[in-house]
Amino acid sequence: MPRSLKKGPFIDIALLRKVEQAVEIRDKKPIRTWSRRSTIFPKMVGLTMLIHNGRQHIPVFITEDMVGHKLGEFVLTRTYRGHTADKKVKKR
C-alpha cells in the first residue's frame, strides 16, 4: 500500500545527513545503511549505497530510474536454491 501523499516520502534522518555530507564534499566512498525503508531522493543519484540484506551489505549504484522507490527493493533478502530432485529409493 503506498504512503499517503499528505505525509510525503520517508527517509531516515541519519541517512539523509550522510547523503548531504557526501554530496557536499563530493565523496565517492559508499554509504553503508541498514535503512531499507528509506525512499530514494534525487540527491542520491550517482552515489553508491551499501544496503543491508540481513546478512551482509550489498553495493547498489543509484540511478535516476530508482528515484521514488525504496532502498530495500534493490537488494534481495532471501536466496532461492531451487527444489531438490526426488531421490528414488532403489529396491534390491
Swiss-Prot record:
It comes from the Bacteria. The keyword Transmembrane does not apply. The keyword Transport does not apply. One of its GO terms (molecular function) is structural constituent of ribosome. GO terms for biological process: ribosomal small subunit assembly; translation. SUPFAM superfamilies: Ribosomal protein S19. This is Small ribosomal subunit protein uS19. It comes from Buchnera aphidicola subsp. Baizongia pistaciae (strain Bp). Protein S19 forms a complex with S13 that binds strongly to the 16S ribosomal RNA. GO terms for cellular component: cytoplasm; small ribosomal subunit. InterPro entries: Ribosomal_uS19, Ribosomal_uS19_bac-type, Ribosomal_uS19_CS, Ribosomal_uS19_SF. PANTHER family: RIBOSOMAL PROTEIN S19P FAMILY MEMBER, SMALL RIBOSOMAL SUBUNIT PROTEIN US19M. Keywords: Ribonucleoprotein, Ribosomal protein, RNA-binding, rRNA-binding. Belongs to the universal ribosomal protein uS19 family. Signal peptide: none annotated.
